[in-house]
């Protein structure tokens, strides 16, 4: 193990020991905020610290076995020491790999709920229909993960599907999996309205935004313009006669969020504010990412909405994720929410990129 890594792990272990002592003190027990902070810090450290303790135990066992082999005369004891030495030496590389993976920088948003926005893009009616197909796909996937979906806002298309639809997904580590869905999803198929059977290419864009609290994204009321208007259903039909729909504009950034599907103006304002915080955060994150990529001269994709990430070819029952070069000939299953193969490949690719970035930083 790298000496610097070993030193850093020793520091982490000492910090966990100190936190454990602090959590026993009356001063901390009576301070709920501080206690929560310490527990959160401990939770972030404990997994890698436990693996480090396991690693040190293995190294000590190797040293003990070597000492026995150097001093022992009994044949049976020598044989046992050889077996123990072999087993522990074989265990070193795997546990070091686990520790190195645990030390990779974590996305602070991985545990968050998300807001997903799907928009029909290039392709007119067919793009809107495909946006509806993607919504169904994500709903079915959410069911397999025991996640809860709440619709936030939707503009239905007369031909079917949606020109725009937004929904919240709540559950365990939602962002860690769905964040890879951000980008342009291209579909190739024969539209139902196509009499000559020609294949049309259309696009729907997906944005996956981590839900941000008002503490994480502070927005001044003086920076907001709030407009109210009448909610309308598909085709522009008014569904109520009061100005219950809400549109909020963040004046400094120009970011806009609107909601009309809540039960009241108050509900719609809350929904719009939730979406606004997420969009402001995303805009700032994209700005920082662009600066980081420029500094690194890194040409890899960023998952931006304009980037084509996946192609769904219906005639050939084929789906290709262009970021990892993975093609699955089971589009029918993918559209039923079975997208785990893509997500696992993308998680692994993210880990690989983090390792490469860390190696570059260490050079």
From Swiss-Prot:
Checking HAMAP family in the record gives:
Rel_fac_1
Q: Which GO terms describe its molecular function?
A: translation release factor activity, codon specific
What are the protein's UniProt keywords? Cytoplasm, Methylation, Protein biosynthesis
Provide the function of this protein. Answer: Peptide chain release factor 1 directs the termination of translation in response to the peptide chain termination codons UAG and UAA.
Q: Which InterPro entries is this protein grouped with?
A: PCRF, Pep_chain_release_fac_I, Pep_chain_release_fac_I_sf, Prokaryotic/Mito_RF, RF-1
Coiled-coil regions listed? none
The organism encoding this protein is: Mesoplasma florum (strain ATCC 33453 / NBRC 100688 / NCTC 11704 / L1)
What is this protein identified as?
Peptide chain release factor 1
**Major localization listed first in the record, in broad terms:** cytoplasm
């Amino acid at each position: 193990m790298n000496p610097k890594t070993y030193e850093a792990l020793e520091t982490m272990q000492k910090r966990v020991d100190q936190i454990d002592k602090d959590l026993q003190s009356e001063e901390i027990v009576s301070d709920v905020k501080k206690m929560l902070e310490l527990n959160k810090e401990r939770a972030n450290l404990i997994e890698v610290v436990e693996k480090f303790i396991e690693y040190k135990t293995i190294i000590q066992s190797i040293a003990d076995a070597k000492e026995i082999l150097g001093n022992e005369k009994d044949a049976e004891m020598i044989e046992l020491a050889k077996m123990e030495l072999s087993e522990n030496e074989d265990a070193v590389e795997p546990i070091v790999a686990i520790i190195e993976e645990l030390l990779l920088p974590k996305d602070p948003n991985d545990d968050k709920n998300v807001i997903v926005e799907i928009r029909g893009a290039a392709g007119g009616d067919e793009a809107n229909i495909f946006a509806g197909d993607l919504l169904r796909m994500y709903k079915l996937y959410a069911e397999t993960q025991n996640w809860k979906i709440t619709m936030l806002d939707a503009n239905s298309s007369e031909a079917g599907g949606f020109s725009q639809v937004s929904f919240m997904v709540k559950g365990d580590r939602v962002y860690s999996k769905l964040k890879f869905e951000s980008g342009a999803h291209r579909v190739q198929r024969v539209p139902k309205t196509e009499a000559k059977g020609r294949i049309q290419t259309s696009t729907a864009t997906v944005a996956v935004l981590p839900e941000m609290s008002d503490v994480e994204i502070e927005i001044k009321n003086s920076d907001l313009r709030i407009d109210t208007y009448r909610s309308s259903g598909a085709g522009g039909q008014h569904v109520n006669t009061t100005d219950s729909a809400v549109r909020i504009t963040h004046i400094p950034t120009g970011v806009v969020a609107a909601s009309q599907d809540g039960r009241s103006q108050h509900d719609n304002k809350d929904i719009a504010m939730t979406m606004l915080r997420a969009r402001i955060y995303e805009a700032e994150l994209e700005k920082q990412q662009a600066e980081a990529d420029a500094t690194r001269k890194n040409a890899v994709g960023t998952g931006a909405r304009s980037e084509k990430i996946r192609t769904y070819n219906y005639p050939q029952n084929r789906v290709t994720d262009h970021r990892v070069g993975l093609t699955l000939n089971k589009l029918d299953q993918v559209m039923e929410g079975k997208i785990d193969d893509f997500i696992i490949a993308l998680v692994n690719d993210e880990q690989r990129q983090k390792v490469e970035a860390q190696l570059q930083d260490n050079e």
